[in-house]
Amino acid sequence: MTTAKTAQKQGQARRDQLRGQVLSIVEQQLRSGKTFAEINVADVVAEAGISRSTFYAYFVDKSTLLRIWYDEFTQVVLGAVQAWWSLDDTATSQDVRAALERIMDAYRAHPELLAATHEAIGNDHGVREAVDHAMRRYIDGLRTHIEAGQANGFIDPSLPAAETAYWLQWMAERGLHRMLREEPESSQKLLAEAYAAIVWNSLYAPARRSGG
């Protein structure tokens, strides 16, 4: 490995380590009741034991930090959601419930950062673009699954695939981040079961009843 590549690798490792450290502090402050807008860089770098210049050497501002995290989170969700989008004509309602649980597990890991992301949508163009891009990918993926299911007889053929995917994905996006941040565990279980029932009865159950 050349000296330049070694330095680049070390720089990326330092950036990743610093990002994890700073994000942990931001999450702690969010849990304490602060909004993302109320968190200032001076307090974060002081707690992290780094200088402001070090922070800004890696991140343009705190919103950049949030966008980088959200892009990584999107990849985690896209990995988890494959358990749903890979279901076929043998899938049961319990299979759907288990697949959706994997997605919910991804959201459960960082509810405060998700809430901060949605808070920032209103005033940060970059965050808004990151969320919109992620949602387009989620919607396109579900649309493809619906179309495949319709072609193979296990999803209701009367549904408009693109529009159905749009509604199901936006319902889940808003519902999941609010549920995991605001509802007690007992309510979360009931809400998760209701989510799975909505998906099953909207997409798969009609095809089963008609013998598809």
Label for each model-derived stretch:
Residues 1-17, 158, 181, 207-212:
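N-terminal intrinsically disordered/low-complexity leader segments
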Residues 68, 82-109, 161, 168, ...:
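Hydrophobic alpha-helical connector segments
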Residues 128, 150-197, 206-212:
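Hydrophobic/aromatic-rich alpha-helical bundle segments in the mid-to-C-terminal region
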Residues 14-29, 44, 69-77, 142:
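Generic hydrophobic, amphipathic alpha-helix propensity
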Residues 21, 32-64, 68:
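Helix-turn-helix
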Residues 79-82, 105-109, 125-152, 162-166, ...:
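Amphipathic alpha-helical packing segments from all-alpha helical-bundle domains
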Residues 59, 119-123:
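Short helix-capping/turn signature of helix-turn-helix
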Residues 93-118, 140-144, 169, 204-209:
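Helical hydrophobic small-molecule/effector-binding pocket
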